[in-house]
């Protein structure tokens, strides 16, 4: 189906300056101090999109240019067993992972898929730069899965000691590559390595928490409960 990009503006959290997203803004270029930016969506009333599948049911409140294949969503359900144990009548649990009996079908078993599908959906389809993500495990696995299944060029930087976290249900597409900081290093070393890679104009930093798509993506965890 033809998807119309979500309409939104970016707002600087430091001074309230509103501006348009030029495609991959991680900060307000006019702000004189470090600050996050947030998205304000044209559609104010929250309604899941019945015409879209999986994660993109929440596209009206996601800064996305397109939808991608293979997404799942968190699932919110009313607890019985734990609620009874705790003596609660209205306990609801939100689950992110693989539990098909409940409708949860995140094949990496990680809530980080909500971030990956949002960030990668923010990328224009004609983007030619290689996305760079630094991670200690879960984030890398989620981005690798999403990019592999949707032919998005990706370079992952992880600590060598965390290579065991990089398991997948099927082989990765060649568009995904992995580099590692030396044994004995940690997540911060992987970040430094990714920063060095991004000095080459062929690569682009994903941005981590500075990327509004990350934060709004994980916010869908709450939307599933509404």
Model-derived features with residue positions:
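PLP-dependent amino-acid enzyme catalytic core
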Residues: 1-226
